[in-house]
Amino acid sequence: MSKEQSCVLKAWEVTVRKTQQAKKRANSIFGTVSVAPQTDDDATTTTEENDDETSTNRSSIGELYHAERILPNGDYYTGQWYDSFPHGHGKYLWTDGCMYIGDWYNGKTMGRGKFGWPSGATYEGEFKSGYMDGVGLYTGPSGDTYKGQWVMNLKHGHGIKRFANGDVYDGEWRRGLQEAQGKYQWRDGSYYMGEWKNATICGKGTFIWTDGNRYDGFWDDGFPRGNGTFKWADGSFYVGHWSNDPEEMNGTYYPSGDDGSPEWDPKDVFTNLSEYKICSGERVPVLPSQKKLSVWNSSKRVEKPRRMSVDGRVSVGVDRAFEKMNMWGTESGEGAADIDSTTRRDLDAEMMRLEAEGFIQSLRPSPAPMRLPRAGRKQGETISKGHRNYELMLNLQLGIRHAVGKQAPVVSLDLKHSAFDPKEKVWTRFPPEGTKYTPPHQSSEFKWKDYCPLVFRSLRKLFKVDPADYMLSICGNDALRELSSPGKSGSFFYLTNDDRYMIKTMKKSETKVLLRMLAAYYNHVRAFENTLVIRFYGLHCVKLTGPIQKKVRFVIMGNLFCSEYSIHRRFDLKGSSLGRTTDKPESEINSNTILKDLDLNFIFRLQKAWYQEFIRQVDKDCEFLEQERIMDYSLLVGIHFREASVAGELIPSGARTPIGEFEDESAPRLSRADVDQLLSDPTRWASIRLGGNMPARAERTMRRSDCEFQLVGEPTGEYYEVVMIFGIIDILQDYDISKKLEHAYKSIQYDPTSISAVDPRLYSRRFRDFIFKVFTEDN
């Protein structure tokens, strides 16, 4: 019997004897207690384990003690140890020469410590979950130093960087790059003080040379761009508009006296500035979070795999925890304890106390190991000749090629109100033989309509979409793919071959909603660079000629799951419970299956800086949708698990590295190295944004068996390193008469708060409440 089980039984025995002393029936209560027998594996420590483990204080599992261990791969650890992991203060030496001395928590570097590389580089400061995170000092092998704030191995916050060549930067950092306000001083004494963007001088700032000359004004990509003033040490100055393009340069010289205009060309400033380079600094060869611990698995138990439902319900709840402790006897009463209501209340109270103190959780069966879902096939059916929608696809591609190809580039993102007029549309006729403006084609004649073309052209520029790439994705030689089944609304979805864009057929009502809210949408996505709402790139209509005169409306959107990482799990989250579970058996669920609220078995933990930005942005996006009377939207979430064994089992964060006689050390496995490489490579940081390729931790949750519609399960303390992609989709449903009737009808049958069709204000509040429970700060 384990120590925890003994504690529970003793506590129960004390309570029962106290309440039943007058009746003297305490012994009968425990007459029916039976505890599952302990296996040989649980009770025995093998000789091999004793050979590999040397400890200065051999304590039982569950106690903190000092240990010195030479691990199977040659690594060495000395320090405090708890339940098969370094825990407390300790020193770990890797065989490649790396070393860590400092605080540990459950096998992860956590707290203060010092990490050393074989090159001589060191980091001394705060760690969190294996990452350099907090305040710390990094010293590179060539003498570079950075002292300041870190987030997940990246310089983030205020910090001072001293380069080996003598240059110094003192200012703000974001995701490893100079950002916002900062001062950069070169070794000759010249310095720039002002705004930065992505490690380049950009925005408003001042450059001062050692000879006393200075430039005050606006910058772009390291050079003056826009209005600015160049001042000489003698007091004369030049005011004007600056640019690398001589045709855009213009200004006026103001002498300090009557000297007149000097023999000076403003282009000399650009020539001079080109000599002042921004140092990129050194690149860390291997990050602390990439270092694995070769921790010996002392238990060597092989649990029988248990079937786990997609929502994580596996024998949970207090009743199931005590299935083998038959306190109340059999149903027939044979051997049952005669316990009155007073005793029951006392026992219930004791149970609640034990629950609060954590004893009950220790007896609950651990959930079955999680596995990578079965890989799904590439989504969609290729639309080739003979497909029922082949001509419709040709019409769409012809129209896009015509519409995008003829448009002039956008000069300004400031649009007139008339550009958003729903009547601002252009019809173009496409006969098979072609016209002066349209090419000949092999499809039947059709008409093409562009809605608010200038607005969507500006949106594409705002979202940094290259027109040529846009046309190539949709209209290239590769055909579109039609998803296997239409959506709940009856719309069809099409994917481009490169997965970058999704095309959806729309009802007339949805088109009206988008046109009505287009101005507000444009202003919102322009004001908030990190908005999570879906990106719209175009709105079009194909009108087929003939007796039917059928109209098909399309909206072109960004595909949220277009990523370099494979998506293992997908969730569509609304915050409601009615009908919010998958209708597929678990055997049919694969990586393409979109799961729902009641299928969710994780809480997602974001780093502090990202979490705060996430909270702000969700609030802003929901306020926008609420103002536009939009409801029934979802947060679409994709998860890429960074670590799994060769057998497909997910490896929790901080878990033991698979080694020993039961596993193949040379077997390939999915690693977090790719993501750590992304974090350490400055050229790839731009791909990380709010909702896009975000490193995070997913904590597994379990739902209680006595709670039918528990939206958010209870945390288990089991974490997984993940990359997350998420965004808000389905934002074209307003609270119209049909939704009001749906709400009234379903409210009679179900709990009104459990259904999706509710007033936009209530929907927004419920959505945020749910999302802020599912996403939390990683502290």
UniProtKB/Swiss-Prot annotation:
Q: Name one GO cellular component term.
A: cytosol
Q: Sorted alphabetically, which InterPro entries does this protein's record hold?
A: MORN, PIno-4-P-5_kinase_pln, PInositol-4-P-4/5-kinase_C_sf, PInositol-4-P-4/5-kinase_core, PInositol-4-P-5-kinase_N, PInositol-4/5-P-5/4-kinase
Q: Locate the region Activation loop.
A: 735-756
Chemical reaction(s) catalysed: a 1,2-diacyl-sn-glycero-3-phospho-(1D-myo-inositol 4-phosphate) + ATP = a 1,2-diacyl-sn-glycero-3-phospho-(1D-myo-inositol-4,5-bisphosphate) + ADP + H(+)
Going by the record, the broad EC class of this enzyme is transferase
Its keywords, alphabetically, are:
ATP-binding, Kinase, Nucleotide-binding, Repeat, Transferase
Q: Name one Pfam family in it.
A: MORN
Output this protein's name.
Phosphatidylinositol 4-phosphate 5-kinase 4
Organism encoding this protein: Arabidopsis thaliana
Gene name, please? PIP5K4
